[in-house]
Amino acid sequence: MDSKGSAQKGSRLLLLLVVSNLLLCQGVVSTPVCPNGPGNCQVSLRDLFDRAVMVSHYIHNLSSEMFNEFDKRYAQGKGFITMALNSCHTSSLPTPEDKEQAQQTHHEVLMSLILGLLRSWNDPLYHLVTEVRGMKGVPDAILSRAIEIEEENKRLLEGMEMIFGQVIPGAKETEPYPVWSGLPSLQTKDEDARHSAFYNLLHCLRRDSSKIDTYLKLLNCRIIYNNNC
């Protein structure tokens, strides 16, 4: 591994260690968050938000690194970006386009959108890990990040479900979420088409993880700090 790769890996490990230490200091275990189930959770709303914000930021960092690594390794000169625009499986969700729009959106709507985005990524992340494992010569930097993102997405979803339950007690979160149907594209024998499908999926993951991170930080500021942040 070159010195640049070692430095990047060291930075990620340091970030993960810092996040883990912060969570332990706050008395928040990573898994399970509530040993007796969400209904018996004693973790404060502030701690749940702190944990969720850190995890979502970490996921977005990993997503950006994985996309950049894939772009450098497989997409140079292929023109994949033009095919990736507006082709995400989550495009049907009416998400705010920028921070200003998100600030005008009710907190219940933002939380439902975050839950919808997280749930819509469970299936593609599982298959992303499976298919990347089968790729010949795939860099460890891509596979390790894919595995981590899948695990952290589940943790973040668990945390957001508990936040939703505390902020809106008794509410039923039953909004449908987009279903991903891109597995055949990840398994095609046409190498360029397969790489294009991976590129598109990673592009969408980076985009959606950025949205989740932005919405969560806004919710944290609005609900926990009464917009004084």
UniProtKB/Swiss-Prot annotation:
One of its GO terms (cellular component) is extracellular space. InterPro entries: 4_helix_cytokine-like_core (IPR009079), Somatotropin/Prolactin (IPR001400), Somatotropin_CS (IPR018116). One of its GO terms (molecular function) is prolactin receptor binding. Residues 1-30 form the signal peptide. It comes from the Eukaryota. It is found in: Secreted. Its main location: secreted. Disulfide bonds join C34-C41, C88-C204, C221-C229. Glycans are attached at N61. The modification Phosphoserine is found at S56, S64, S120. Keywords: Disulfide bond, Glycoprotein, Hormone, Lactation, Phosphoprotein, Secreted, Signal. Gene3D superfamilies: 1.20.1250.10. One of its GO terms (biological process) is lactation. Transmembrane segments: none annotated. Interacts with PRLR. Belongs to the somatotropin/prolactin family. Prolactin acts primarily on the mammary gland by promoting lactation, mammogenesis, mitogenesis and osmoregulation. This is Prolactin.
